[in-house]
A protein has these predicted regions:
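Glycine-rich loop-to-alpha-helix module at the N-terminal edge of alpha/beta enzyme cores
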Residues: 1-81
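Rossmann-like NAD(P) dinucleotide-binding subdomain of oxidoreductase/dehydrogenase enzymes
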Residues: 50, 82-173
Length: 173
């Protein structure tokens, strides 16, 4: 049931074209704000992640630093995504039309939950997809930490939807 509600929220947000119509500068600014919050709270997040997955605190803090770098990297790409013509033969036309897919359903593995989570969110964010993301059942706390950061920087409701559960049930749905 929760997965259905999350999907409906993501679909509503996508249909409102919140990310699709957000200009590149605003997308970039929000992603950089997420990166900044991740850096500011890396020690707190690192301790939480260490408690839930058993890695050293240093490894976990480094994972949060890497996640911040991921958001910064994709923030720099927001104004590089464009529709364009591709050179081709004299009697053909070859072009790329970039458009968002809709709702992206993502399942995060347990081994690098913060790093992989950030990549999944950032990649979908820049192209305008909304996201339903299922974190690993073995590492649920770090995804709640992420959720708080998204709220703190003002990510619009429905853009990123975190759903906990077991892969056998939630992931299959």
């Amino acid at each position: 049931e929760e997965i259905d509600l999350a999907f409906q929220a993501a679909k509503r947000a996508f249909d409102k074209r919140i990310l699709v119509d957000m200009d590149a500068k605003n997308k970039s600014n929000m992603m950089r704000a997420i990166a900044q919050k991740l850096r500011e709270r890396k020690d707190e997040g690192g301790k939480l992640l260490s408690q839930e997955n058993g890695k050293t605190i240093k490894q976990c803090v480094d994972e949060f630093k890497g996640a911040a770098d991921t958001f910064d990297f994709y923030a720099g790409l927001t104004d590089k995504i464009e529709n364009k013509l591709i050179p081709s033969g004299h009697d053909t036309l070859n072009y790329v039309v970039l458009e968002p897919f809709g709702v992206a359903l993502q399942i995060v593995p347990w081994n690098y939950p913060v790093s992989i989570f950030s990549g999944m969110v950032a990649q979908n964010w820049i192209v305008g997809n909304t996201i339903v993301i299922k974190p690993p059942e073995l590492c649920p706390i770090s995804s709640n930490f992420y959720g708080q950061i998204f709220e703190d920087v003002g990510v619009p409701k429905g853009i990123i939807n975190i759903v906990h559960g077991y892969g056998e049930t939630t992931g299959r749905k």
